[in-house]
């Protein structure tokens, strides 16, 4: 067990109520890490980064996804080093971990509901992933807020095993809404998916995932790292990006 992980585990502690919800429900919504008076600045930085992205980094399907928000500017540097997020990784992954990916996702008006799914199945020796979603816009029931099935991370099956139509409403599902600047932290094995955006405006978010340190990341962050990013981030960020 490396020294950085021990330090993170020692310094990052969740309130009991949040730790319990992660254990029991598999997800939690926290009003942070972006302060209310910084949300407009974050939204402007998001839009500018999306417009400046190289076409190779843009993937358009039922939503628009822009990869590698680690290297999109200083407005995003604090998101993946947020203390409660790292504490959740210590609780769920429970071993040295690193960032696998951090990207933007926009649900345009009319985007249909996403199928319930898991990001990673639970492995025999525990849970391999923690996901997070930072709300650039308010998440509401009409604009594509993410739905979760509480406790489903404890199941041995996945939605496709038990649902004929994984886009259908599932008994007991809960909408994870919140004001702009909030963060959803979730166990990668919990059933989840975005809902339909029935509003007249896009719904924007920044999403990412932490994985076990020895696993292969979704994006080769070391190869993509820009000098200006390396020059401004600290030791904790470099450790989490595995570029120290």
Describe the predicted segments one by one:
Residues 173, 180, 201-205:
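Active-site lining segments that contact anionic ligands and/or coordinate catalytic metals
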Residues 73-76, 170-172, 194-195:
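Active-site rim elements
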Residues 29-30, 132, 184-186:
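Short hydrophobic-aromatic micro-motifs
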Residues 1-25, 30-118, 122-123:
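Non-heme Fe(II)-dependent double-stranded beta-helix
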Residues 2-8, 52, 190, 195-244:
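Non-heme Fe(II)/2-oxoglutarate
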Residues 178-192:
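Conserved metal-binding segment of the jelly-roll/cupin
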Residues 110-177, 215-223:
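Catalytic core of non-heme Fe(II) oxygenases with the double-stranded beta-helix
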């Amino acid at each position: 067990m490396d020294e950085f992980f021990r330090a993170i585990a020692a310094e990052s502690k969740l309130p009991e109520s949040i730790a319990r919800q992660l254990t029991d429900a598999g997800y939690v919504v926290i009003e942070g890490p972006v302060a209310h008076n910084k949300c407009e600045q974050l939204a402007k930085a998001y839009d500018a980064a999306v417009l400046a992205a190289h076409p190779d980094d843009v993937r358009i399907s039922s939503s628009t996804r822009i990869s590698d928000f680690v290297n999109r500017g200083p407005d995003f540097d604090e998101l993946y080093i947020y203390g409660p997020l790292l504490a959740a990784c210590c609780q769920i992954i429970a071993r040295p971990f690193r960032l696998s990916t951090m990207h933007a996702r926009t649900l345009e008006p009319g985007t249909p509901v996403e199928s319930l799914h898991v990001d990673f199945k639970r492995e025999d020796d525990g849970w391999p992933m923690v996901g997070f979603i930072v709300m650039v816009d308010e998440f509401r029931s009409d604009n594509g807020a993410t739905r979760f099935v509480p406790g489903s991370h404890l199941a041995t099956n996945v939605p496709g095993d038990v649902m004929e139509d994984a886009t259908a409403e599932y008994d007991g599902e809960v909408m994870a809404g919140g004001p702009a600047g909030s963060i959803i932290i979730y166990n990668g094995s919990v059933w989840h998916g975005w809902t339909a955006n029935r509003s007249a405006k896009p719904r924007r978010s920044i999403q990412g995932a932490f994985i076990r340190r020895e696993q292969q990341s979704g994006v080769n962050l070391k190869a993509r790292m820009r000098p200006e990013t390396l020059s401004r981030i600290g030791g904790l960020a470099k450790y989490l990006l595995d570029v120290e």
